[in-house]
Regions:
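Short acidic-glycine motifs
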Residues: 1-181
Length: 181
């Protein structure tokens, strides 16, 4: 117990009484967007277009308890690397002065990898608790320990995370215009 207790900081605001720890920090936040669109007028009746959008983001924070992690001001304790791609192609074709055909096809993909601040660190020996963690780096890290109403240690249970989400969409329309437009 004393090895775990050594990871908890002393109170930083004695005026508020025992157990009050406050800290400020700025989370990591770096987002880059790249967008482009191309229009091609195949003829006076047919317009074809395509667009590309890519966002890369590195977002994260550092836990206030150091190696014991805990909460991270403005973020979760760790680092997330995300890429979102959004691509689409479409067209509009004037078949007659009163009949228009249009359509669009879209694709969206999100790749995300999030690792906690303590990812891969083995605390079994440091804390003297055999059996915590395992051979896989995803099983390691500081254990989640809560003491009363205080903020606990470790990273949120959903970390680490690796995911790829993709979606496709398409829509096609034929419009008939009646009368003056």
């Amino acid at each position: 117990a004393s090895k775990i207790q050594a990871f908890f900081p002393n109170a930083t605001n004695e005026a508020l009484g025992q157990g009050n720890f406050s800290i400020g920090a700025t989370p990591a936040f770096n987002r880059r967007y790249h967008d482009g669109k191309l229009n091609f007028n195949r003829n006076e009746k047919h317009n074809i277009w395509g667009r590309v959008g890519i966002m890369n983001a590195i977002v994260g924070g550092t836990g206030v308890f150091g190696d014991a992690v805990g909460p991270a001001p403005g973020s979760d304790p760790g680092l997330g690397d995300t890429q979102v791609q959004n691509h689409s192609v479409g067209h509009s074709y004037t078949l007659t002065p009163t009949l228009i055909l249009d359509g669009v096809f879209g694709f969206q993909r999100m790749d995300q990898v999030v690792q906690g601040q303590d990812f891969g660190k083995d605390f079994a020996t440091t804390l003297g608790i055999p059996g915590i963690g395992g051979p896989d780096p995803r099983e390691k890290g500081f254990p989640n320990i809560g003491i009363g109403s205080y903020n606990g240690t470790g990273v949120p249970g959903w970390m680490p995370l690796e995911r790829i989400e993709e979606s496709f969409t398409t829509s096609h329309n034929v419009r008939y215009l009646k009368g003056a437009h």
